[in-house]
Amino acid sequence: METLNTLVDLLKSKAKKTTEDEDLLEFEKGKYFFGVVKNKNKYEGITISRKFEAKYSKRIGFKIIDTIDEYTEKNHARIMRYLED
């Protein structure tokens, strides 16, 4: 049975890991950031954010564009789409 571990393994193989601590893994690929929440070595969800620059202030920010909390073929395809951009 496929689980969130499958999607996290996909991120580990295709995106650059930026941070890791006991309850969060972060990956970066192009303009997208992936935050993986874990609880006692069990993955609970993936948050996908997009990096943007404010028009006038030139500040860098992040906007959450998607969240994934279970493995499905549709979610697998969504992750792949973000990794290919």
Please provide the spans of the model-predicted regions.
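Intrinsically disordered, low-complexity regulatory segments enriched in Ser/Thr/Pro
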Residues: 34-71, 77
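Short acidic DE-rich linear segments
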Residues: 80-85
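Glycine-centered tight beta-turn/hairpin loop motif at sheet-sheet or coil-to-beta transitions
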Residues: 29-33
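Negatively charged, low-complexity tracts enriched in Asp/Glu with abundant Ser/Thr
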Residues: 1-28, 57-70
